[in-house]
Amino acid sequence: EAEWVHGSMGGTAGARHGLLSRVAWTEDDDLAGPQPSALKDPNAFGLFDTLGNVWEWCWDRLDPARYGDYRVLKGGGWADPEWSCRVGVRRGNAPDARVEDAGFRVARGPVATDDELDGGQGWSERADRHRASIRGPLPVGWTPLT
């Protein structure tokens, strides 16, 4: 969730990274569903649609004591009022839920050289070559290098 917030803010300090009508699809647009990406203005990091359009899944749990495995959703959606399309607003749902106003953003940290690989996520040129050579179903989650 913290990574999502950092990316969505795009280096700004406010609840939004620009005039909402220029950066997000909300209920004010009277839409029947989500819109194609990148039709509104990006933030300073070059990211589009971090607010409005669809809520974005985060890996963090919403409140484990109360909701168990529910995961955090951020950003607001195309059918939501302006107040919910702010960086600080959060919602949650079960990880296997199917909802029309939620999606996900594929994100990846920087790729390390083999010398810089610290065992964290295993992202390096060597790790990527190894994963590309796997035949058949890909392993779920982190793939250790053997």
Model region roles, listed by residue range:
Residues 41-43, 66-146:
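Disulfide-stabilized, aromatic/cysteine-rich ligand-recognition loop
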Residues 1-89, 100:
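Functional-site microenvironments in short loops/helix caps that host divalent-cation chemistry
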